[in-house]
C-alpha cells in the first residue's frame, strides 16, 4: 500500500516538473558583454542629412576631420551641407573577443537628419567606460525603414534615423580576463530562486562528488574547478549540459501600463468572485470660430475665438460572476467572458488581487 502511494506521488511530481539544462538556467560570473560607444559622421546621404545651420556640431566635426586629412577650410565658410549627419555608434564587446574579430554596430542619428538610408559611416573609434579605444567602426548602413514625401505629405514605415552595420567594427584591443586563474567559478541564476540554487548544487555534487558545488545565495552557486583554462573549459562544458528538474514557477501576472498588454504564466489561478465594471468616457470637442468685421473699411480686426464642448458619459456595468479557474485556459476564458478591454482588465486584475481572488503576483512595468 505504501509503495503504491509513493509511486503515485512520484508520478505526480514528475508531471509537474520538467528537466532543463544548467546552461539554460545560469550564466558564468564574469563572462559577459561590455558596452562600447563612439561619435562619428555619416556621409553619402541623398539630401536627408543634418541641417548644418541648426546643428553646428556637425559642421565642427567635419572641419576637424578634414583638418586631420590635411584639408583646411577657410575661416568663416558657411557650408550648407545636406548629405552629412552626426551619429552615435554603439556596439557590444563580446566575452573572450580577440584582436581582428568583427562585431556588429548600431548607428543612430543625433541631429535633425531625415534619414540615414544609403549613408556610409566614416571611421569611428569605439571606446569603453575607461575611455580606451577597443574597436574601429566603418561601413555602409543598412536601414530597415522606408519613407517618401511629396507636396507636403509624407509616409514613413519604421525608423529611418537608425541603422545597423553587420560586422562593421574591428576589435583592436583585447580585454584582460581572469578566466582560468582561480579554483572556483560562480554560476549566476537567471532568476533568484533558493530551490533552484539548491537543485543545481545537488546535481553537480551527485556528478562530481560532494563539496564540488555550494549554494551561496538564491542566485549564486559556487563551483570548485581545476586550474588552467583548458581544464576549466572541459569542466564547465560537462556541468552546463547537466539536466535539473525544474519545479513549477511562481504564478505571476505582468501588466504594461504604457501599452495596456497583460501577460500571465500557466500557474495563475482564480477563485470565484463577482465583478462589476462601469465605462466612463469623456469627449472633448474644440472648434475655432473666426469672427470678421461686417464693414471692410471700419477698422475692425479679425478675431479667432475657441469654442470647447465637453461631453461626459457613463454606462453602468452589470455584476458578472467569475468562476474558479484552475488552469491558464480556464483563466483566459473567465476573463474574456467579462468583455473588458485590456485597460479595464488591468484595474480588474488589481481589484481581484486585493480581494484575494487572483492567486498570483501582480507586477506592473
From Swiss-Prot:
Keywords: Bacterial flagellum, Periplasm, Signal. GO terms for cellular component: bacterial-type flagellum basal body, distal rod, P ring; outer membrane-bounded periplasmic space. The keyword Hydrolase does not apply. InterPro entries: Flag_FlgI. It comes from the Bacteria. Residues 1-19 form the signal peptide. Pfam families: FlgI (PF02119). Its main location: periplasm. Transmembrane segments: none annotated. One of its GO terms (molecular function) is structural molecule activity. It is found in: Periplasm; Bacterial flagellum basal body. One of its GO terms (biological process) is bacterial-type flagellum-dependent cell motility. Assembles around the rod to form the L-ring and probably protects the motor/basal body from shearing forces during rotation. NCBIfam families: PRK05303.1. Belongs to the FlgI family. The basal body constitutes a major portion of the flagellar organelle and consists of four rings (L,P,S, and M) mounted on a central rod. This is Flagellar P-ring protein. It comes from Salmonella typhimurium (strain LT2 / SGSC1412 / ATCC 700720). The gene is flgI.
Amino acid at each position: 500500500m505504501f509503495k503504491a502511494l509513493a509511486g503515485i506521488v512520484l508520478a505526480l511530481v514528475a508531471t509537474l516538473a520538467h528537466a532543463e539544462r544548467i546552461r539554460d538556467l545560469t550564466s558564468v560570473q564574469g563572462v559577459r558583454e561590455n558596452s562600447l560607444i563612439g561619435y562619428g559622421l555619416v556621409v553619402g546621404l541623398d539630401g536627408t542629412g543634418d541641417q548644418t545651420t541648426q546643428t553646428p556640431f556637425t559642421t565642427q566635426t567635419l572641419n576637424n576631420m578634414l583638418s586631420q586629412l590635411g584639408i583646411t577650410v577657410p575661416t568663416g565658410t558657411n557650408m550648407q551641407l545636406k548629405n552629412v549627419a552626426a551619429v552615435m555608434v554603439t556596439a557590444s564587446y563580446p566575452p573572450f573577443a580577440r584582436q581582428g574579430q568583427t562585431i556588429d554596430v548600431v548607428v543612430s542619428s543625433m541631429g535633425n537628419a531625415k534619414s540615414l538610408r544609403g549613408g556610409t559611416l566614416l571611421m569611428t573609434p569605439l571606446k569603453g567606460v575607461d575611455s580606451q579605444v577597443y574597436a574601429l567602426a566603418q561601413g555602409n548602413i543598412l536601414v530597415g525603414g522606408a519613407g517618401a514625401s511629396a507636396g507636403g505629405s509624407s509616409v514613413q514605415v519604421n525608423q529611418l534615423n537608425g541603422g545597423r552595420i553587420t560586422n562593421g567594427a574591428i576589435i583592436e584591443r583585447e580585454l584582460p580576463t581572469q578566466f582560468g586563474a582561480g579554483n572556483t567559478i560562480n554560476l549566476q541564476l537567471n532568476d533568484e530562486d533558493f530551490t533552484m540554487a539548491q537543485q543545481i548544487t545537488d546535481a553537480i555534487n551527485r556528478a562530481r562528488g560532494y563539496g564540488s558545488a555550494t549554494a551561496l545565495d538564491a542566485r549564486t552557486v559556487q563551483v570548485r574547478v581545476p586550474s588552467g583554462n583548458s581544464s576549466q573549459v572541459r569542466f564547465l562544458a560537462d556541468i552546463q549540459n547537466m539536466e535539473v528538474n525544474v519545479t513549477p514557477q511562481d504564478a505571476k501576472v505582468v501588466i504594461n501600463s504604457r501599452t495596456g498588454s497583460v501577460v500571465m504564466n500557466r500557474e495563475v489561478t482564480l477563485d470565484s468572485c463577482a465583478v462589476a465594471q462601469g465605462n466612463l468616457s469623456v469627449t472633448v470637442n474644440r472648434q475655432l470660430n473666426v469672427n470678421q468685421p461686417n464693414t471692410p473699411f471700419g477698422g475692425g480686426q479679425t478675431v479667432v475665438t475657441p469654442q470647447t464642448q465637453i461631453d461626459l458619459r457613463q454606462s453602468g456595468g452589470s455584476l458578472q460572476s467569475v468562476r474558479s479557474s484552475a488552469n491558464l485556459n480556464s483563466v483566459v476564458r473567465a476573463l474574456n467572458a467579462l468583455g473588458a478591454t485590456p485597460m479595464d482588465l488591468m484595474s480588474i486584475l488589481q481589484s481581484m488581487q486585493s480581494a484575494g481572488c487572483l492567486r498570483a503576483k501582480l507586477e506592473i512595468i
